[in-house]
Structure formats: structure tokens, C-alpha cells
From Swiss-Prot:
Belongs to the NAD-dependent DNA ligase family. LigA subfamily. The active site is at residue 118. DNA ligase that catalyzes the formation of phosphodiester linkages between 5'-phosphoryl and 3'-hydroxyl groups in double-stranded DNA using NAD as a coenzyme and as the energy source for the reaction. It is essential for DNA replication and repair of damaged DNA. It comes from Nostoc punctiforme (strain ATCC 29133 / PCC 73102). GO terms for biological process: DNA repair; DNA replication. Its cofactor is Mg(2+); Mn(2+). NAD(+) binds at residues 35-39, 84-85, 116, 139, 178, 297, 321. This is DNA ligase.
Length: 678
């Protein structure tokens, strides 16, 4: 019987534990573990996935910006994704971030940074129509959030009407900020809960999150949440039309009636940012609310737009957290892993050491630059730290304790899996195997293809993928669709019934939408969110494959790095052949509106009344109306109690406000097209 590798077993255990804890906390509002325990398990999982990149699954808690919305509230799509921030844990990492973004914008003279205290609460997105608060939503997973407008209205520091005195009157404004519980209020709430025999809240952040998701807004009102605004957007317009910088945006928020954290500061250099961070390390303990770090943003909106986003983070901002526990240990070996993108990641295998109640024995060394910077060698005594209290990281080498016989570590010149020469491209820190036939890359690409957020092929797990590659049954993801039950039965522990079931599951994956196929291709930097953004713009693979790089970069949320990666991917002959094979196999490389919406006249909207308002991302309003009518729906010009759906674009106007007051369901263009495809 084949033994499951300890790291595989532990990774799966951690995912299940964290998913159970997230469900209990976010959906049931009944935490089953302490926040610190969740953080510890999360960081352990994160470290395992860093050490074993091939174990990273799209449905892992580490791949989420937040949690999926519960069903008790209406799910709504954020007009602009609500991203989380990349973390740094010391000044060196802050400087590293500063150097990274500067490499993307080399011709820049001076730059300003805005530093803000990182409030430990819950992120909210607020929508104002003609100055009136019409919607408040949670972060959710960054793309979809929950409509908690009734609860948001109870927070006294959130204005129900914006103050436009002396300002341009804006038709639509979106404000982002943090809802939190002041420490004194938190203390009073727990005292009351103790008297009532109720379970106490673990900390102010949990209390704030649980309060916001109360179905009874009267309870929310009693808990006296507070709110600090920290940014704003003007849908349908360039944000620079009202503010050119983050500093100006904060000033504008104050003028509009929002409470803004008074401790923000404009800094002229990273050195000044570092001083701000060091000052608040101790001073924050005197604040009337919880804060766990400092948020650093580039002040210029123009520069922010140039830098764009990764799948999860803006490149122009970072959260600088406060330091964690450190301890000495000995490096016993330096191993090198190969991920699905071919990246070679060095890992320090260390004598086990206790940090924050857990045993640490491995730590990522990131790349050869980091190894050279540390001058780390096998046999060295090092200081290992748990960044963010959990992620193990080697922070320095105690060279005075170095044994005489040690030698500098050199990254391999050939892939440790396929033995082909590796490359390091100019300007990159990562060494890569570029052999498309490398077993490690192929296994990783297939595991990614079959994962839940991609083609979601049930029954095709890691062990089976490895068998398929090792026995040379597949050379690419397209080969999966040529597998037969007879071929599969030759594999270890694969019977006829299981083989037939797997063949059927593979065939069913041909029905997955274009956005999932694009994500499954594993193009560098293209996550599931980016794939959705791309397929909302480009309805067919041909449109995307022939798009200009500058046009791809113009999509909100798709920065230069992603655009370049997508553009270059479609110019590789092997990738073009893969697309041709997938098309021949019948996979969906076309968005629903190109295939079914104009197709068989399915009357799925029969008896339903629609109103279309605002500017849609890709469809003209008449085109949207035609699609609805072809599916049996009725389209009217005004919102009433008889309206079933409001299809909303940018600059929706008063129709949206009326629809919200009547409780009418709103649909984005993407949601409309998804319904047409069902």
C-alpha cells in the first residue's frame, strides 16, 4: 500500500480544518477556534504551500482574498475588486517592495508615500447615488460581497448623505474603509455578554465581523461600531478627475463627512516611512482601537494606475506588520523544489526548533538572490523567524558560528527533475526549468487544470496525475480527453467502474465556461479573478489571442505584468497548438453570449421583466435588451414593483436607487450572460 507523504496529508488536514473554521465563523457566526489558532494553522498551510508549490490548490484558504458570502444576505458583485494587501514584516521587506515597484517604473524622479495605521476590523465598500447611501457590502472574496446595507446604516460615523458643499456634486461614489469596535465599546459588550451568560467575543475584530453579519440591524445599532474611510472611486470616471493623490482623497473623504484616521502621514522617502512605522510600534498600544501594522501606499493615483494589480494585491501598496518571534537553529540541508511554472525554489531544511508553540524545520529561501544575500550554507547556524507569527523565514546567518568546511550554496544549473538546463531571465530573481516536457511542470499543470476553480474534474487527484505522467499516458492537458477506461484500468488501484466514472468526469469538464478554461491554462500571473476580468472583455479565445498588449493592459485590474504574460503566452507555437487541440476536443473557448445567448431561443426568461440601466462593459444597451427578449424576457424603461431584474452598468442613475428601495435583484452584465448560459 502506497504511503501518503506527510506533507500531502498535513496540507489536506489544514485545508479541512481552516475551511471548517471559516464556515463556522463567517456563516454560522460561531467560532470553533481562537483567532490566534486559526492564524497559526493558516500560516502553517501557507508555509507548506511555499515549500511544496505543487500542493497549492485553487480552493486553498491561502488563495482567497476573503471568504465566500453566506446565503443569508444577498450576494453582489463589487464594481471594482476589493483587493487585500501584500504583507511585509520588517524594513528590509518594505525596501524590497519599494525596489520591486521602482523596477516597473524606472523613469521616476521623486515619489511620495502615504502611511496609515492598519485598523484591525472588517473592510466595507459603500455606494452613494446622488449623495445618498444606497448600498454597503462586505469584502467577501474580493469579487463578490454581501449586501449588509441595513446594518451599515446603523454606524454613526458613516454618513447617510454626503456633504458636497464647495465640492463637485458626484452622481455616484464608492467609498472603501474599515469598520471596527473601539476598545472601550468591545469591553462593555463582553461585560454585557458575560452577565447574560453568552459566549464572549475573542477580540474586537471578531466582534466587528460578527456584528456586521447580524440579520437584526437593531443589534448592530446597539454595538456602536465605528468606521474610518481610506479611499474612494468614481465609477465610469478616472479617479484623478476629483483627486490626484491618496492624500487628496483622504482630505476629500473628510470634507464629504467621513471620519478618517487622524494619524496618517505624508512621507517623502522610505526612510521616513520606516520612522513612522518604528514610532507606532510602541505608541499604538495607547490608541483606543486595535491596529496591527502600517499601510503604505504610493501617493500618486497616476503611478498607482501604471503599476496595477497582481491576482490578489495592488502593487502600489503594502501592509507593514510588526515583528514576531525569532530563534536560532542549524541548516542541515538546502533542497530545491520545482513548481508548475518551472520555478526552482530553494528550501532550508533545519534542525527542528520551537517557535510560538509550533515546530519549525523548513523555511523557504525564495531564490538564488536571497541565498547570496544571506550567504547561507549547509551547516550554518541561522536565526529563523515566524513572519506574521507563523511563516518560517531565515532572517540572518550567524557567521561567527560557521564550521570551517562549509561551502557557498550554488543553485543547480540543471533541473533536479528532468536534468535539462535551467535559465534565469534578465531582470528576474527566479531560476526556471523551461522544458515543457519536464515531469514536474507537466504534473503541476495538470493538477492545476483539474482543480476546483479550473475545470473541476472530480476523481483526478495528485496521485493519479503522477501515475498518468510517469506512465507516459499524457503529455499535456489535452491528452486527458483522449483517455479511455481501458487505458485507465492499467493504472494502480483503478477498476473498471472508477475508470468509467473518471472518463465521464473528464468529458463533463468540456462544459465548463471560457473563464475557467482560461484560468486552467496556467498562464503566469493569471488567477481565477483575472481570468474572469479577461473573459468579460474578450468573448472568444481568438479575440484574446489577437488582442494588443496595450488593450489587455487597459482592463481595470489587469496590470502590465499580466498583460505581457498573456500576450506572450499566445505567441508560443506549442500553446497555439494546445488551443487548437482543446477546440477540437470541444472545450468552451467562447463566452456564453457568443454561443448560447444568440442560439436556440431558450425561453429561460419567460414571464420575467427586466430594466437595463447604465453603461455595460461590453454590450450595448440594445444588444442586452435583444438577448433578454430572445430568451423570453420583457424589457421596460422604468423600475416598478413588477420589475424582476435590474441589469446595472456604470453610471446607473436613479433607477438603481429605486430598485434598491424596492428590493429588486440587480445583475451585472457578467451575471446576465451567465444566466443566459444556464
Amino acid at each position: 500500500m502506497t504511503q501518503i507523504k506527510p506533507e500531502v496529508k498535513r496540507t489536506e488536514e489544514l485545508r479541512q480544518l481552516l475551511q471548517q473554521a471559516s464556515y463556522a465563523y463567517y456563516v454560522l457566526d460561531t467560532p470553533i477556534m481562537e483567532d490566534s489558532v486559526y492564524d497559526q494553522l493558516y500560516r502553517e498551510l501557507q508555509q507548506l504551500e511555499i515549500q511544496y508549490p505543487e500542493l497549492t490548490a485553487p480552493d486553498s484558504p491561502t488563495q482567497r482574498v476573503g471568504e465566500r458570502p453566506a446565503t443569508q444576505f444577498t450576494s453582489v458583485r463589487h464594481n471594482i475588486p476589493l483587493y487585500s494587501l501584500e504583507n511585509a514584516f520588517n524594513i528590509d521587506e518594505l525596501q524590497g517592495w519599494d525596489q520591486r515597484w521602482r523596477r516597473q517604473v524606472p523613469k521616476i524622479d521623486s515619489v511620495e508615500y502615504v502611511t496609515e495605521l492598519k485598523i484591525d476590523g472588517s473592510a466595507l465598500a459603500l455606494t452613494y447615488q446622488d449623495g445618498i447611501l444606497v448600498r454597503g457590502t462586505t469584502r467577501g472574496d474580493g469579487v463578490m460581497g454581501e449586501d449588509i446595507t441595513q446594518n451599515v446604516r446603523t454606524i454613526r460615523s458613516i454618513p447617510l448623505r454626503l456633504n458636497f458643499e464647495g465640492l463637485e456634486i458626484l452622481e455616484r461614489v464608492e467609498v472603501r474603509g474599515e469598520a471596527f469596535l473601539p476598545l472601550e465599546v468591545f469591553k462593555q459588550i463582553n461585560e454585557e455578554r458575560q452577565k447574560a451568560g453568552e459566549q464572549l467575543f475573542a477580540n474586537p475584530r471578531n466582534a466587528a465581523a460578527g456584528t456586521l453579519r447580524q440579520l437584526d440591524s437593531r443589534i448592530v445599532a446597539k454595538r456602536r461600531l465605528a468606521f474610518f474611510g481610506y479611499t474612494l472611486h468614481i465609477p465610469g470616471r478616472d479617479d484623478t478627475s476629483i483627486a490626484n493623490t491618496q492624500w487628496e482623497a483622504l482630505e476629500l473623504l473628510e470634507k464629504m463627512g467621513f471620519q478618517v484616521n487622524p494619524n496618517h502621514k505624508l512621507c517623502a522617502s522610505i526612510a521616513e516611512v520606516a520612522k513612522y512605522y518604528e514610532y507606532w510600534d510602541t505608541e499604538r498600544l495607547n490608541l483606543p482601537y486595535m491596529t496591527d501594522g502600517v499601510v503604505v501606499k504610493l501617493n500618486s493615483f497616476k503611478l498607482q494606475e501604471q503599476l496595477g494589480f497582481t491576482q490578489k494585491f495592488p502593487r502600489w501598496a503594502i501592509a507593514l506588520k510588526y515583528p514576531a518571534e525569532e530563534a536560532p537553529t542549524r541548516v542541515e540541508n538546502i533542497a530545491v523544489n520545482v513548481g508548475r511554472t518551472g520555478a526552482l525554489t530553494p528550501l532550508a531544511e533545519m534542525r527542528p526548533v520551537q517557535l510560538a508553540g509550533t515546530t519549525v524545520s523548513r523555511a523557504t529561501l525564495h531564490n538564488s538572490d536571497r541565498i547570496a544575500q544571506l550567504d547561507i550554507r549547509i551547516g550554518d547556524t541561522v536565526i529563523v523567524r515566524k513572519a506574521g507569527e507563523i511563516i518560517p523565514e531565515v532572517v540572518r546567518v550567524l557567521k561567527e558560528l560557521r564550521p570551517a568546511e562549509t561551502e557557498p550554496f550554488v543553485m543547480p544549473t540543471h533541473c533536479p527533475v528532468c536534468d535539462q538546463a535551467v535559465v534565469r531571465e534578465s531582470g528576474e530573481a527566479v531560476t526556471r526549468c523551461v522544458n515543457a516536457s519536464c515531469a514536474a511542470i507537466l504534473k503541476g499543470s495538470i493538477e492545476h487544470w483539474v482543480s476546483r476553480d479550473a475545470l473541476d474534474i472530480k476523481g483526478l487527484g495528485e496521485k493519479l496525475v503522477h501515475q498518468l505522467v510517469d506512465k507516459v499516458l499524457v503529455h499535456s492537458v489535452a491528452d486527458l480527453y483522449e483517455l479511455t477506461a481501458e487505458k485507465l484500468c492499467a493504472l494502480e488501484r483503478m477498476g473498471q467502474k472508477s475508470a468509467e466514472k473518471l472518463v465521464d468526469a473528464i468529458a463533463q469538464s468540456k462544459n465548463q465556461p471560457w473563464s475557467r478554461v482560461l484560468y486552467g491554462l496556467g498562464i503566469r500571473h493569471v488567477g481565477s479573478v483575472n481570468a474572469q476580468l479577461l473573459t468579460q472583455k474578450y468573448f472568444t479565445v481568438e479575440q484574446l489571442a489577437t488582442a494588443k498588449q496595450s488593450d489587455i493592459e487597459g482592463i481595470y485590474g489587469i496590470g502590465a505584468e499580466i498583460a505581457q504574460s498573456v500576450y506572450q503566452w499566445f505567441r508560443i507555437d506549442a500553446n497555439q497548438r494546445l488551443i487548437e487541440r482543446l477546440q477540437a476536443e470541444g472545450l468552451q473557448l467562447t463566452a456564453p453570449e457568443e454561443t448560447k445567448a444568440f442560439g436556440d431561443g431558450n425561453q429561460i426568461f419567460a414571464g420575467k421583466t427586466f430594466v437595463v440601466t447604465g453603461t455595460l462593459p461590453t454590450l450595448k444597451r440594445d444588444e442586452a435588451k435583444a438577448l433578454i427578449q430572445k430568451a423570453g424576457g420583457k424589457v421596460t424603461d422604468s423600475v416598478s414593483k413588477k420589475t424582476d431584474y435590474l441589469v446595472v452598468g456604470e453610471d446607473a442613475g436613479s433607477k438603481l436607487e429605486k430598485a434598491l428601495s424596492l428590493g429588486i435583484t440587480q445583475l451585472s452584465e457578467a451575471q446576465l450572460l451567465e444566466m443566459l448560459n444556464e
